[in-house]
Amino acid sequence: LLENPIKQAIAFAVINRSMTRKITMGHFGHTQALVYASDPERIKRNRSLVRPIKEIFEEILPKYNNAVFDNKQDNQSFHKNILELLPTVENVDLAYFDPPYCDSHADYQGFYHLLETYTEYWKDKEFVNGIKRYEPQRVSGFDKKRDVLNSFEKLFEFSEEIPHWLISYNNRSYPGIEEFEKLISKYRDVKVEAKTYHNGRGGKGSVAGSQEILFVCKPKKKHFVSTNQQQELVNEGF
């Protein structure tokens, strides 16, 4: 119905947000979701549980439309593996990385694939054993202990030309905070900020008492000169 790809993207964003408003346990993979959604006490706290998705969509659509503005810049958006993307981009000042919380027991595909599956209209999806598993399984390289250290090494090597990094993390993740800080320190000066969850919000990563971590990374104290800047200096005779 919508031929404009930008309007299509906004519509998908709104319908996905409408669906997440009906989540009961922090994700879509909980087998007791319908039971919890029928609990009168839960309904009191979240009326969206019993509201039609269309009604929620119509309520929040104006907010999304009002958020659209022209920043007078040429903007780009990418949807691909970060290790494939980084070698292709340049002139980036700041990178924010939000990797999966390895070893937190969060099955991101099982918990949240519904949104992508809906948006892609079941493209290339094959469900196996009823609703228990689906194919193809996608592996990021950051969610298995055997792969994650090597993947982070590649991530940081490919990000050498980006001066500043922000990295979201969780103190329940692998590698641990000290080991991860040591790994980052090979490439950047790093400061660690922590925020403790006092209440659980669903999912293993946000249980009460766990900490959300932010690694604030900046160039080492010696003056940072990117490869592009080095070439400019050479061209100018320095």
Tell me what each language-model feature is:
Residues 102, 138-140, 172, 220-222:
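Short, glycine-/Ser/Thr-/acidic-enriched flexible segments
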Residues 107-115, 183-185:
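Glycine-rich, phosphate-binding/catalytic loops in enzymes
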Residues 1-110, 123-137:
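SAM-dependent nucleic-acid methyltransferase catalytic core
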Residues 96-98, 166, 216:
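Structural motif
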Residues 115-157:
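Glycine-rich S-adenosyl-L-methionine
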Residues 82-85, 153-156, 201-203:
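Generic recognition of flexible, low-complexity loop/linker segments
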Residues 139-188:
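Conserved Class I SAM-dependent methyltransferase catalytic core
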Residues 177-181, 187-231, 236-238:
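Class I S-adenosyl-L-methionine
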